């Protein structure tokens, strides 16, 4: 088995990288290297800050000089990434906007935002492979694996802090499009129902409406009506797990092809109508936020994929 030995790297810590732990910083620098190996080189003193040994919990300061030793990466570990090279290349085609502070992409349905839970490939891993020179790439928020649409990534720690503050202060507006069962009543503009998250024995997350849950609110607007379905715009005020999916179900209008909260008869109707749909019809259509560097208010829209467009066209033609 061949191995590849990179050279020693000296990295000067910029102001926006200060405050993070050295172990977390090394994970962004040594992409694909197991955590166990990172802790091993820290323990053995192979990583130095300002020529001194440090502990994994050491917090970096602006101006620190970090010595990163050569790390041997086995060829067979690299081979494990190769099946995903096409997915990595495909990510380049779905970038909607990019500058020195942020990157925004139109996440495809079926791709997780993070590897893990049995998935070796996620959007963030793909972006790091696509942008090996990027010193910082972190998700600002998440989308469910089967949800497509606008996904915001920070390219600086200062940008991540600013955008997270906007999320906390409800300064970020997200708009989703969902195809739901039946005729959504126009007077139902808001669903307020507390949500409780449960973890099943299988490890699967299920969310249900419960008075013991966290306060949750979603606003709705009818976009288009069809014979047995409605396209609604959903704007979550809070950001709970599976919030839109559970709130539409609670309102009596589950989303098309939702394998956890959906309705199989509705899915069958869509299949028999010839829509060709096989994925969850939930799309993050737009995101409005204040740019962390310029202060400009931005609204970025993501077009629907061909599967969703085709489904709507078939339903329109059948009206």
Swiss-Prot record:
Sequence ranges assigned to domain S4 RNA-binding in this UniProt record: 20-83
Enzyme class: isomerase
Annotated keywords: Isomerase, RNA-binding, rRNA processing
SMART domains assigned: S4
Keyword Nucleus found: no
Gene Ontology molecular function: 23S rRNA pseudouridine(955/2504/2580) synthase activity; pseudouridine synthase activity; RNA binding
GO biological process: enzyme-directed rRNA pseudouridine synthesis
Pfam family, one: PseudoU_synth_2
Catalytic residues of the enzyme: 144
EC number(s) stated in the UniProt entry for this protein: 5.4.99.24
Signal peptide (UniProt feature, chain positions): none
Family as reported in the entry's similarity comment: Belongs to the pseudouridine synthase RluA family.
UniProt function note: Responsible for synthesis of pseudouridine from uracil at positions 955, 2504 and 2580 in 23S ribosomal RNA.
Protein's name in the database: Ribosomal large subunit pseudouridine synthase C
The species this protein was found in: Salmonella typhimurium (strain LT2 / SGSC1412 / ATCC 700720)
